């Protein structure tokens, strides 16, 4: 696509001057260059999806425990815990990222995938924790208590009653955590020290450059990968709902 004197290229068009409603010519140059050996797009995409899924799993697990503590228990320091969970909301992103980077350097996790996953999880935790706290408060504890009365232990009550009941909220928290991690740029750049390559990290320099052919192609891959994972989450949710319906229908 060419939209002015300097011109911007797009993933599937060679020319798209204003005010034309449709492109004048189409071209696959952006996609061809993206999947060429120089870009290593497959490797970067795999790393991005892996980091985002790991972040979603870790964040959702911690958020579930935090949500249960905040919604079901009254203890000393409860409000302090709530404040700590929401703290990333209150600190400017740049200040927060610098602080996390220093902490991870001291822990020896800077420049590692584990450090990036941990940093992303800290950012995503407030969103996921709020989702899970509200879900657990709405669900209450009556079904869990009934399961225990029927002889279910703590682990069995969680696996057979609590988690299935909370599956929509769990998938919502996981989806939120996934998209936050998948789209992180600045935090990944700092914590990853340029060693951990993700889709957002590789795409940003092309967005800032004059020729946006590769950036547009990366954008297409970015959207497609996100939709694919969300479709997977939707399939999992539908399967869980179908199992619950079959169970109650006998």
Language-model segment annotations:
Residues 51-85, 98-105, 141-143, 158, ...:
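Transmembrane-helix boundary motif in ABC transporter permease subunits
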């Amino acid at each position: 696509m060419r939209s002015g004197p300097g011109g911007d290229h797009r993933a599937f068009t060679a020319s798209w001057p204003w005010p034309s409603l449709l492109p004048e010519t189409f071209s696959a140059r952006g996609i061809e260059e993206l999947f060429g050996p120089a870009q290593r797009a497959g490797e970067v995409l795999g790393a991005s999806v892996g980091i985002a899924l790991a972040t979603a799993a870790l964040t959702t697990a911690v958020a579930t425990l935090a949500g249960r503590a905040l919604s079901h228990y009254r203890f000393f320091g409860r409000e302090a815990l709530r404040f700590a969970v929401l703290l990333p909301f209150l600190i400017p992103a740049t200040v927060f990222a610098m602080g996390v980077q220093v902490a991870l350097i001291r822990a020896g996790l800077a420049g590692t995938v584990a450090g990036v996953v941990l940093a992303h999880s800290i950012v995503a935790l407030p969103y996921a924790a709020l989702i899970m706290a509200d879900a657990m408060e709405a669900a209450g504890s009556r079904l869990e208590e009934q399961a225990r009365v029927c002889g279910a232990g703590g682990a069995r009550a969680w696996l057979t009653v609590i988690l299935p009941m909370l599956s929509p909220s769990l998938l919502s928290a996981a989806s939120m955590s996934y998209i936050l991690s998948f789209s992180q740029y600045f935090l990944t750049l700092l914590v990853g020290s340029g060693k951990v390559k993700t889709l957002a990290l590789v795409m940003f320099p092309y967005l800032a450059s004059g020729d946006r052919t590769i950036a547009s192609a990366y954008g297409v891959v970015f959207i497609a990968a996100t939709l694919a994972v969300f479709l997977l989450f939707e399939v999992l949710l539908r399967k869980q709902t179908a199992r619950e319906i079959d169970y109650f229908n006998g």
